[in-house]
């Protein structure tokens, strides 16, 4: 039977890992990893208020889930029987395989199922009377085609007007002094660029880099930027809250939880970051060892973040702590 503490652990993980589904978390490790999930959420810098709101929510018990599945299975056959019958296909129009009969029968538009038979004309009988020869009519005479194209070159009717002709221009020499002078390139000063418009010196080209990569987290002296300092301070507070908690045996529970995940899913997943941050080691998990967390009540105080770095802290959770909080939610958040 699950205790009230176990339900509280699941509710805390739901608010952290909303994108997870029940199939993402192994059910066998739910009880052992529960206290770590709750502790990770309570040590979050600004996430305890949501945990208080989730306490009033209730989960479906296994018996209620089984009854709901049975009701869905019973209602499925009824819905199938009440479905509309499939429409019947229209009867095919009879067709004849005989080419002669198909040519003699035609369909009358506007009448359904009515056909009209046209008698096939029979060839004329041979009576022995010679047939009269038909003389083709003489073709109509064709009119001559007039050719209106001029046969001679047009001449100048007015001798006083000169005939306009395109004068032949003399060829330009291949190289001229002007072309030679314009093709000469003017040397530019080294390190400067000339403007293509007025030829004024444009000065040195701007650099695309600003003290190295733009995404660097440190300045030239190796110090963290103001925003990174706030995130690092929050991460240190949350790590100390988790690793130094004394409400239960955090070291042993975390080690058993990590080994349980290793046995069930083959990988510790996000629990690896928790063990590495706190310098914990794994312990061989066995179902009998779940009695260690049977009556555990997690107590933790949310770290106070009132340092000067709080003014520049714009992230909800820093990088390492995000792995701790969300990773712990992935362990049990949706598996019950």
From Swiss-Prot:
Subcellular location: Secreted; Host nucleus
Single GO BP term: effector-mediated suppression of host innate immune response
Signal peptide start-end: 1-19
Induction annotation: Expression is induced by plant roots.
Keyword Secreted found: yes
GO molecular function: transcription regulator inhibitor activity
Cellular component annotations (GO), alphabetically ordered: extracellular region; host cell nucleus
Keywords: Host nucleus, Secreted, Signal, Virulence
KO phenotype (gene knockout): Decreases virulence in A.thaliana and G.hirsutum.
Primary location: secreted
Region (Disordered): 59-99, 189-230
Low complexity composition-biased segments: 63-74
Subunit structure: Interacts with A.thaliana CBP60G; the interaction is direct. Interacts with A.thaliana SARD1. Interacts with G.hirsutum CBP60B.
Described function: Effector that binds transcription regulators in the host plant to suppress the host's innate immune response. Inhibits the host plant transcription regulators CBP60G and SARD1.
Name of the protein this chain belongs to: Effector SCP41
Naturally occurring in which organism (per UniProt): Verticillium dahliae (strain VdLs.17 / ATCC MYA-4575 / FGSC 10137)
